[in-house]
Amino acid sequence: MANRKSLIKPTLLRSFYVSVVFFCLFVFIGSVTPAAGADNETIPSYGRGPHEVLIFSDYFCPPCRALEPKLEPVLDALYKQGNVRIRFVDTPMHRETPLFAKFYLYAAKAAPDYRSAMRARQVLFALAGKENVFWMDERVEEAFRKEKVAFTPFDFRTVQPELNGMIRKHRVDSTPTCVILSPGKKALKYTGADGILKGLGSLQ
């Protein structure tokens, strides 16, 4: 399970590190020119059910990559049941993550449906698994075009306040993490593959 303690061990420095990581979200806006009219972007959600499922993950987190093939069929089933709203919250535990998070949101804007979002995540996780690659906008763009993943650039900074706020609100300091929000109930937080799958199973 990836966590910020493994990146900077002294606990007193964790808040400083988090600030630096979120600052990187600005740095990695990249060379693609944003599309006009993207003033009120939000982290997309999929489904209209009463239970909100927040998936906090990092494409460069090995446990997240290992969980993803097991997670997909569970989320698919919940989505088809119609009792959940799913949101993927890319959580920057590695320096390359903001770039990939940006392209996930680009893809979600171009094709705002659940299946397209899952396809974009599949491609991004596969790219993150490649070793010795210096990732930049052009390389992710090339991969998206090759895999026929549509994407629409926009000013990624418009999403950052919501992204940062969700990570802080739910005190997410490791990935993968899942938070389930149900009407009239306390938020339930699960970490690690087994915990997350068990928690999601309670909604089936």
Predicted region positions:
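Structural alpha/beta surface segment adjacent to cysteine/selenocysteine redox centers
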Residues: 59, 65-141, 170-173
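Non-catalytic pre-domain segments flanking phosphatase-related domains
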Residues: 43-44
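Bacterial N-terminal signal peptides
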Residues: 18-30
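N-terminal secretory signal peptides that target proteins for export/translocation
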Residues: 1-14
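C-terminal cap of thioredoxin/glutaredoxin-like
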Residues: 56, 68, 140-204
